[in-house]
A protein has these predicted regions:
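Short, surface-exposed beta-strand/loop "edge" segments at domain boundaries and coil↔beta transitions
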Residues: 7-10, 42-44, 123, 129-133, ...
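Short amphipathic beta-strand/extended segments with alternating polar/hydrophobic composition
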Residues: 14-20, 132-139, 164-165, 180
Length: 223
């Protein structure tokens, strides 16, 4: 826990997370520890290739196998775009671990997974609303790009035909997110795959930011 002193003098207790020690080295004056969060637990082999279910079913299977609690509720995942669609793993795939499965499930849901401060697996979405303003006096250096990053198309490769299926907004004048060969996006009619990909695109299209590098005063309350 980090005890953060706020501007009004009050103290905010900021949990820094849950970690597992993987290596300990005793030095002359201290004990050096190397630790990782619970995401490392998902580097276990996945053998549920016969699984058929919704995104939540795949997540729950991985969490149970790797002994990590899932922070999101089933109703929350089912309500997301593509959350209620029945998925299955295409036979020819490059899935080796549960972490690979989570990567592809996150793609389908248009989000990403993290291990939160309570040590639970959590699905998050890309936001569009500012959460904090960092004043110039709090920045030691800054370097801003001269373009805006935004996505107006997605590309998903059909494993059977080896053809990249392209879906775009109108106008299509932004970046394209390449989904590669996602084993969960292979089955069903072309119309079904298009629906899944367009739902992913709808989630990605909210992303709009200017890439930058900056050295600032650290704030452990920010994720």
């Amino acid at each position: 826990v980090f005890h953060l002193v706020l501007a009004d003098g009050s103290v905010e207790d900021v949990p820094m997370g849950v970690f597992e020690v993987s290596e300990a080295n005793r030095l002359a004056k201290c004990l050096e520890l190397k630790a990782y969060d619970f995401m490392l637990r998902f580097d276990r082999s996945f053998n549920g290739f016969e699984t058929v279910g919704t995104a939540y079913d795949f997540i729950a299977l991985c969490c149970k196998r790797c002994k990590v609690e899932f922070a999101n509720k089933r109703a929350e995942i089912d309500a997301m775009p593509n959350g209620g669609v029945t998925l299955s793993v295409y036979t020819e795939n490059d899935i080796e671990t549960c972490r690979d499965v989570l990567f592809y499930v996150a793609q389908v849901l248009g989000g990403f997974f993290i291990i939160n401060r309570e040590g639970k697996l959590e699905l998050r979405k890309y936001g569009k609303d500012p959460v904090m303003k960092v004043e110039q006096r709090h920045r030691f250096s800054s370097s801003f790009s001269d373009f805006i990053t935004r996505y107006t198309a997605v590309s998903s490769t059909n494993k059977q035909t080896q053809i990249a299926e392209y879906y775009a907004l109108d106008p299509d004048n932004g970046l394209t997110m390449n989904l590669g060969v996602n084993p969960l996006l292979q089955f069903g009619l072309k119309e079904t795959r298009e629906m899944l990909c367009r739902n992913i695109l709808a989630e990605l299209s909210v992303i709009r930011y200017v890439p930058f590098d900056s050295d600032t005063i650290g704030n452990p309350a920010l994720d």
